[in-house]
């Protein structure tokens, strides 16, 4: 149990650090304070690899987004922090449907993965960010939903392409169970 705790803390710390670095240095602005964020593909990898501890995906996004907002903007948007965490959490919760640690990432696994990420993003950017920003910043609903929609779609595309590729590469690097036999 102790090793799992250490592994969880280390994975969360490394994941949050990668989240911040990628978010700050690799982003493509598209609308307001919204940009294409490639760190979500890496968050997916951590969320799935440590899926049985999906809390890693949550805290990687949560801590990473808090620190990124603080460093980059000097102000923290708690709704977007929660959205980043929820994205990692939901993807991790469904991780058994697309367990890449066994060396397989089939078409059906890819479909499950993208359905899970769509659900996570729908909750995060369809509900949490517009309502949270309305409470925190009192902005117009039309702006909030437009910004959340753009971010959700951009993140879906990023995760669908980048996340799927990272998971496929990771799966191909793992030994499939039963693939080693006596010759």
Curated annotation (Swiss-Prot):
Primary localization: membrane
Subcellular location: Cell membrane
Entry keyword annotation includes Membrane: yes
Matches recorded under Pfam families: ECF-ribofla_trS
Recorded GO CC terms: plasma membrane
Bilayer topology term: Multi-pass membrane protein
Keywords for the protein's UniProt record, in alphabetical order: Cell membrane, Membrane, Transmembrane, Transmembrane helix
Transmembrane segments: 11-31, 44-64, 74-94, 111-131, 149-169
Gene3D superfamilies assigned: 1.10.1760.20
InterPro entries, A to Z: ECF_substrate-spec-like, UPF0397
Protein family per UniProt: Belongs to the UPF0397 family.
PANTHER family, A to Z: UPF0397 PROTEIN BC_2624-RELATED, UPF0397 PROTEIN SPR0429
UniProt protein name: UPF0397 protein stu0306/stu0307
Organism: Streptococcus thermophilus (strain ATCC BAA-250 / LMG 18311)
